[in-house]
Amino acid sequence: MVAETVAIAVWAMLPAYVPNNVAVLAGGGRPIDGGRTLDKLTDEDGVLYDENRILGDGKTWRGTAFGTAAGVVLALLLNQLQPFVAGTVGVPQFPIAAAVALAFGAMLGDILASFLKRRTGRQRGAAFPGVDQLDFVIVSLALTAIVATGWFLATFTLPVLVAIFVLTPVLHVSTNGLAYAFGLKDEPW
């Protein structure tokens, strides 16, 4: 039972787990924020926001596009494998809306985390415990719940969600450590 729950959790989240890794490999190019800062904006009291970049150089249009595309393509490939796996483990097929929501939601979660990092004075690559490990999960799940509600409710049962929130930080730290060891990342987190 636990093994099947873990298998379903990993399978269902693969389209969200892959995009940020692909973005690291395919990134570069024009930053989403265009190099802009928030220094020209003020709050209702006229106090200037910080002068940090909105997102930073690590969030690019190319990385976002390639990451999202990779997650969607992976979901479509998993759909082809699902009939062979479903006899052993009850893994789901991915409707296109769920595939896009999982993949793009993962990228959006990472972008939002970058925004939060800049607002809290953290530079690119600085650790942000908790946020670094779960940002993409929370946003991808939320977006999927909105655009593919029936599939989300059928797939992400409470035990599957628990498995995701327990496994993801471990997987995140492990894969980032490997990427760092292979010189693909400047920091091991």
Swiss-Prot record:
GO CC field: plasma membrane
GO terms classed as biological process: glycerophospholipid biosynthetic process
Reactions the enzyme catalyzes: 2,3-bis-O-(geranylgeranyl)-sn-glycerol 1-phosphate + CTP + H(+) = CDP-2,3-bis-O-(geranylgeranyl)-sn-glycerol + diphosphate
Keywords attached to this entry: Cell membrane, Lipid biosynthesis, Lipid metabolism, Magnesium, Membrane, Phospholipid biosynthesis, Phospholipid metabolism, Transferase, Transmembrane, Transmembrane helix
One example GO MF annotation: CDP-2,3-bis-(O-geranylgeranyl)-sn-glycerol synthase activity
Keyword Transmembrane: yes
Domain of life: Archaea
Known EC number: 2.7.7.67
Membrane topology summary: Multi-pass membrane protein
NCBIfam families from the UniProt entry: PRK04032.1
Function field: Catalyzes the formation of CDP-2,3-bis-(O-geranylgeranyl)-sn-glycerol (CDP-archaeol) from 2,3-bis-(O-geranylgeranyl)-sn-glycerol 1-phosphate (DGGGP) and CTP. This reaction is the third ether-bond-formation step in the biosynthesis of archaeal membrane lipids.
Protein name: CDP-archaeol synthase
Name of the gene encoding the protein in the UniProt record: carS
